[in-house]
Amino acid sequence: YGSMRDLVLGLTVVLPDGEVIRTGGRARKSAAGYDLTRLFIGSEGTLGVITELTLRLFGQPECAQSAMCSFASMQAATATVVDALRYGLCLNRIELADSVQMNAINRHTQSELVEKPTLFLELTGSKPGVEHDLAVLEGLIQDNGALAFERAQTQEQTNRIWRIRHSALYASRSSSVRSRTLS
């Protein structure tokens, strides 16, 4: 859905001198000067204390479908992402792990996944829309030479795909004594 900066429509801020200001509005774009909403969000509290936020909200999608696929090269994996975006597919999540990361995941989780660049994908929307986009995506994946493709058929399989993806941080940390997590 984008970054927090994209989701904040307006806010109320208390400036260091005590003045209270309100930013934003209903207009998507404005030529009325600086975009104070984005300025304050980007400052992460250094320019003033944010006391209220008006956020853009999204409803729960009717349907969600997860998949993961491996490719012989990063170029093939990224070409698939570029193609999917060009087609305007309803992708909610796209994450990429390279071969080094997949090796670390295998060692950390005692799995036997393909140790090549791997995409973790989630499509969301209406059931017919997701089914259509998934068919298009499967074609793009094949066109770009996927080595392996797994489409989640059950909630358990969906959970497995995202559990694998979320193990990447811990796999990386356990792969080296000197590793550190930066955020």
Label every model-predicted segment.
Residues 1-183:
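Noncatalytic alpha-helical scaffold of FAD-dependent oxidoreductases
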